[in-house]
Amino acid sequence: MRHTVIGAGRYMVAIMNEALELRIGNKVLEVGAGSGYHAATVAEQIGPQGHVYTIELVPELVKLARSNLEEAGYSDRVTLVQGDGSLGYPDRAPYDRIVVTAAAPKIPHPLVAQLRPGGILIIPVGGRLFPQELVKVRKDEKGRIERTSLGGVAFVPLIGKEGFDL
């Protein structure tokens, strides 16, 4: 099976990164590495003091992203992992920020659990195709979450235990 990378587009990457309120030194989880482009933009914004962990389900895309990130000089600031991103990456949790680049039917509980108090999660939520909305989840210091809609979007589905079936 051949996999095609359908990126969120530069405009959507910028919207998502702005909504993340990235800070120098943040520890960030990206779900859905794709080509590695979005992880590179996040790594650039959080600087060498921060780190991006990106998890991708498709082994071929892990290979593509790794190659692109190495070529662009980000391999020391971005760690790529192959696995079910809908479950997050608990090995390095908690995260200051989490960004999901595929639409989930609901906000996955494992991602909220891996978000540090005071953290922000950006995720497209909705149907396998449409409608979908970009959601900003803010976790307060007591672990309560506040959900804000950032508007309608169109993303590929998040495949996994907490996402959609293949």
Predicted ranges, named:
Residues 162-166:
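Positively charged
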Residues 3-27:
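Conserved alpha-helix/loop element of class I SAM-dependent methyltransferases that forms part
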Residues 146-160:
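Conserved histidine-centered catalytic loops in small-molecule metabolism enzymes
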Residues 2-3, 96:
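Extracytoplasmic beta-sandwich strand-turn segments characteristic of Greek-key/jelly-roll folds
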